[in-house]
Amino acid sequence: MHIEKLDFENSPYLGVYGTATDRVALIREGLGEKKLEVLREVLKVPLIETSIMKSRIVGVFAAGNSNAIVVPWYIWDAELEHIQNELNELDIDMRIEPFQSTLTAFGNLILANDKAALISVKFTREEAKKLEDILGVEVERGMIGDYHAVGSVGVVTNRGGLVHPEATDEELEWLRDLFKVDIYVGTANMGVPFVGSCMLANSHGVVVGHLTTGPEIVKIEEALGFLD
C-alpha cells in the first residue's frame, strides 16, 4: 500500500512530527508500535525515533533529502549523537547537519527532494549557498503563493509534489522546472492548504492525516505519482 491515513495522538498534522526521505525518516518519540509499523510499511525506510531540542515537533525543525538532513544548531548533543549512531547502525551514509542560523524551523522553511531545494526568502543568500553544499542540490530562495514557509505549504518527493492552492500557474511551472517533477495544487485534512504539515511522504508512499477526504487522497496520489 502506498497511501494510508493515520493520526498521532489524535493530531492529523503528521508532518509536524516527522520528516521522511528516500533513505530514512525521523519521527517523534512516543508513538505506538502499530503506528510505527504503518509508517514503515508505507514509507519503506527505517525510522529513527527522536526529539529535537527536547521537543516532539521533529518535522518543524528538520528537513532534508537523501544526502543530508538539516537540524537546528541548538539540537542537544545527546539527540545528535543518537541520530548519528542510529544511522551508523543502519549503515546509512548520510549527514545530519546542525545549521547555524537565526532561523530554526527548517521543516517549515525548506522544501527539498534529491534534485533541488526551495528555501524561504528569510534565509540569506550566504545561507542558501551553505545549504546547497550540505544538501548537494541546487537551492533557490522563494515563496509559494504569499507564503515564505515553503515547507509548510508544500510536499515534494522524487516522484511528484503538492502545494498550496494559492500557488500561481507561473509558480507551478517554476517549481516543476526546479524539482524536475510534476507539481499540483491541493489540500489535506478536509481543506487544510498547509499540506506539508499534514503528511509524511517519500518516493515509496505517503501517510496522510486521518481527516483527509477521499477526493483529497485521489489528488495527493496523482500529485505524488502513485496513480498509474
Curated annotation (Swiss-Prot):
**Family matches, as PANTHER family:** TRANSLATION INITIATION FACTOR 6
Q: Which SUPFAM superfamilies match?
A: Pentein
The identity of this protein, by name, is: Translation initiation factor 6
What biological-process terms (Gene Ontology) are attached?
A: cytosolic ribosome assembly
Which controlled-vocabulary keywords does the entry list? Initiation factor, Protein biosynthesis
Q: Which family does it belong to?
A: Belongs to the eIF-6 family.
List the Pfam families.
Answer: eIF-6
Which HAMAP family is this protein grouped with? eIF_6
**What is the scientific name of the source organism?**
Thermococcus onnurineus (strain NA1)
* Lineage of origin: Archaea, Methanobacteriati, Methanobacteriota, Thermococci, Thermococcales
Q: Per its database record, what is this protein's job?
A: Binds to the 50S ribosomal subunit and prevents its association with the 30S ribosomal subunit to form the 70S initiation complex.
